[in-house]
Amino acid sequence: ITATRILKRSIDARQRTIFVNLKVRAYIREMPKDDEYEHTIYNKVEGKPQVIVVGAGPGGLFAALRLIELGLRPVVIERGKDVRERKKDLAQISREHTVDPESNYSFGEGGAGAYSDGKLYTRSKKRGNIDKILNVFCQHGASTAILVDAHPHIGTDKLPRVIENMRNTIIECGGEVHFQTRMEALIIENDEVKGIETNTGKTFLGPVILATGHSARDVYRWLAANNVTIEAKGIAVGVR
């Protein structure tokens, strides 16, 4: 054996004796690659067809990065503020008990999870390429420990920097990110979405991805009022 690499790490603390469980890959007469994670290549997309992404939470940010991979130019529209300015508004909630309806725990860059500890859990094994998601986080500044920990955790103190780096990648590749810009309506012609109208008076044209999370009730009310088909997500409820 010439080298080893940890693939998965977990802690079993159910008994008095604590066990650290490791899943390890052994290399025989060869060495592992130097890179601890896989790098995704993001090429320039200036002048490419644009796609409007409404919401700069995890869904919106990852959608924008995926669009760049596919050679499309993302234009991200976020009703709240950037992740650093948003932190000031969260402090106001605690100190002054005042809530900015557009910049709070639900709205703003990073989404509802940006300031809720940064845990990265999923119980499902069928939700796509989870390893790639973790690699993208590492590429933008997260600790490589999340690649092996059974319960990966970025941390609230580190997550804002990771989110900023993801935004910078989008902009450096030729995409756009617009803060304090709220979608007011979809532009629909002949039953086809052509773009969006915003509270700033500016319209953005192109195919639209709604990554609006669970708190943007105004969006869902507009969709329902304009006969756009919407479906409730199914939920599994356990019974004892």
PLM features: residue spans?
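Residues forming the flavin
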Residues: 1-20, 24-240
